[in-house]
Regions:
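Polytopic endomembrane small-metabolite transporters, centered on the Drug/Metabolite Transporter
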Residues: 1-327
């Protein structure tokens, strides 16, 4: 079992890094904005695989995709995924990874604004350190523009909204992560495919202000091969994520996610040969210091919550067993 978990972690890490690099190549050699087209291709590919799976072993969760909570989750997912690809299109890989790290402190801020859920005071210094480091890197990026920074900010907000909505839907409908994906995928595929031409036409005007990419791949067949490879990698990443979430603690999964961020950051710096100034290095170091600090602080709380939850479940099972015996 342990060897299977390690294999899943390795496969997820390799494919997660590979898909970012492949997507960047697809964007650089498309000649036009294709962020939403890429997202639609991923969803259509995964929906086709899901359709074949449902044909052989139907799932009850698949028939609940028109539930109001499922529709809301699908809309959130349809907004989040194209914007994530658009952010990768308009930013360097390293800058995009720094923007993703901002989701950690921004989640606490947005939860406080909309739900009045204030973070623990002892977590605030680590979150501020993460924000300062990420902003230092973003604002020191010579290739950054107002449009690219704005898209990064929108990506963070939409990712938070997507996570919040999907978590609420999963709680209300009492579904696993895999069942949630089955619910979200049909309508998300429809929404993204229908809106992809419009979104890409708008993003084309924005990306015109960003750096112009020189084509590396000349043959259209080669470009479509990379597009297909991206879809395959996306399917593997999605599947391994669900498997890992079910077999790892939340903290371990967050550590894995941030480890992938560091790997992509290092690779991304050398991807386009863009020079990185000292201030950016300091910003990156500050960001990851804040992340590690946060994870060390949140570890005791995570363990305690898990223990409390386990004790509550045990008490409920014990009470149920006593009731059955008395009857």
């Amino acid at each position: 079992m342990r060897s299977r978990s390690l294999l899943l972690i390795l496969l997820n890490t390799v494919c997660s890094v590979a898909i970012v690099l492949v997507n960047k190549i697809v964007f650089q050699n498309a000649g036009v904005a294709v962020s939403s087209l890429l997202t639609a291709s991923h969803l259509i590919f995964q929906f086709a695989i899901l359709g074949m799976r449902e044909a052989t072993s139907p799932s009850k969760a698949f028939h609940r995709f028109l539930h109001p909570y499922s529709v809301l989750s699908s809309i959130a997912f349809s907004i989040c995924m194209p914007i994530q690809n658009l952010s990768l299109h308009m930013n360097s890989i390293a800058a995009n990874q720094m923007a993703k790290v901002m989701l950690l402190p921004c989640s606490f801020l947005l939860n406080y604004i909309f739900f009045r859920n204030a973070p623990s005071s002892r977590l605030v210094p680590s979150l501020l350190l993460t924000v300062i480091g990420s902003l230092m890197f973003q604002l020191s990026d010579s290739a950054a523009t107002l449009a690219s920074i704005s898209i990064s900010f929108i990506m963070v907000c939409s990712s938070w909204y997507c996570q919040t909505t999907i978590e609420q839907c999963k709680k209300e409908l009492s579904m696993t992560a895999t069942q949630q994906m089955i619910n979200v995928l049909p309508l998300s595929t429809l929404f993204v495919t229908a809106t992809a031409p419009f979104i890409d036409s708008v993003s084309l005007s924005l990306s015109a202000a960003t750096s112009q990419y020189s084509p590396l791949l000349q043959l259209p067949s080669t470009w479509f091969a990379f597009l297909f490879l991206s879809c395959c990698l996306g399917l593997v990443v999605t599947w391994t994520c669900f498997e890992i979430v079910q077999s790892m603690s939340g903290l371990s999964y967050r550590m894995l996610s941030h480890a992938k961020t560091v790997v992509l950051f290092v690779i991304g710096i050398n991807f386009n040969g863009q020079p990185v100034c000292l201030r950016q290095w300091v910003g990156a170091a500050t960001t990851f210091t804040g992340v590690v600090w946060y994870l060390t602080l949140v570890e005791p709380d995570t363990v305690a919550q898990h223990a409390d939850s386990q004790r509550s479940d045990d008490k409920a099972k014990l009470s149920e067993n006593k009731r059955v015996k008395n009857e």
